[in-house]
């Protein structure tokens, strides 16, 4: 049985179109998108303990300092995940992106 992974691609909001085109080139037809705001580790490590304990301050920092980004996710065979990564390296070489591959142990669909 071929192993499958949850393939999650994190891209800046401005690059969503490029990323979806790459997924399509790799033969992906189904995926989900999740919009979020994130802080890079460099920005996060500069926050003081006092700032992190004040929830209003945390919201303010996230609003003002975070980057707008999108997670594009799909479940694929490991070979397909490698193909997507190769295309990303080729076509988005000068852009920021992050890939997470999480092994899928089981999928159970309940239909009513």
From Swiss-Prot:
InterPro entries: UCP005637 (IPR024184), Unchr_N-regulatory-PII-rel (IPR019296). This is Uncharacterized protein MJ1245. To M.jannaschii MJ1244 and M.thermoautotrophicum MTH1110. It comes from Methanocaldococcus jannaschii (strain ATCC 43067 / DSM 2661 / JAL-1 / JCM 10045 / NBRC 100440) (Methanococcus jannaschii).
């Amino acid at each position: 049985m071929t192993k499958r992974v949850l393939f999650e691609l994190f891209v800046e909001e401005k690059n969503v179109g490029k990323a979806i085109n790459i997924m399509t080139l790799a033969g992906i037809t189904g995926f989900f998108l999740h919009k979020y705001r994130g802080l890079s580790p460099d920005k996060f490590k500069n926050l003081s303990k006092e700032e992190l304990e004040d929830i209003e301050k945390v919201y303010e920092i996230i609003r003002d300092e975070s980057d707008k980004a999108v997670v594009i996710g799909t479940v694929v065979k490991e070979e397909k995940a490698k193909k997507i990564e190769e295309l990303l390296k080729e076509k988005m070489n000068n852009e920021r992106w992050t890939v997470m591959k999480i092994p899928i142990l089981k999928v159970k669909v309940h239909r009513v």
